[in-house]
């Protein structure tokens, strides 16, 4: 059962990372293609010159940026929960592979202006520290 859990945790983290990476990148890229930031026509409203296209684009980017922030926070929450569960169950995750997948996701997000790699560093530092502490405590109990 435990071996199955280890494989399942690794497969879940890897697959959810890949799904988020592909879908978020595609959606943001397509959204920006549909609503490009092009300054074209300006009009005069009262005594103030306003660029309606620019105002609309600012609104559109607020929408996509809010959605992007929501999705990234959701992904980071899922990642933290699964890493915490692997500590709780004393799982042996192939950490280098998990980190590679997650940082590749971060690299993809940096291409659309949402670099999450600094948050990933904090998450994995916390995970490694907790995992190390658990292993030290376990060894102390075993040999004390």
Where are these regions (language model features)?
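Long alpha-helical rod scaffolds of large eukaryotic non-enzymatic complex subunits
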Residues: 1-144
């Amino acid at each position: 059962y435990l071996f199955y859990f280890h494989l399942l945790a690794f497969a879940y983290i890897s697959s959810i990372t890949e799904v988020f990476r592909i879908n978020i990148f595609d959606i943001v890229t397509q959204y920006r293609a549909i609503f490009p930031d092009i300054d074209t026509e300006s009009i005069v409203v009262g005594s103030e010159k306003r660029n309606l296209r620019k105002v609309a684009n600012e609104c559109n980017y607020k929408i996509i940026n809010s959605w992007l922030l929501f999705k990234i926070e959701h992904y980071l929450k899922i990642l933290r929960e699964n890493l915490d569960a692997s500590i709780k169950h004393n799982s042996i995750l192939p950490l280098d592979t998990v980190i590679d997948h997650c940082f590749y996701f971060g690299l993809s997000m940096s291409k659309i202006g949402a670099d999450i790699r600094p948050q990933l560093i904090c998450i994995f530092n916390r995970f490694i520290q907790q995992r190390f502490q658990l292993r030290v405590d376990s060894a102390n109990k075993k040999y004390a």
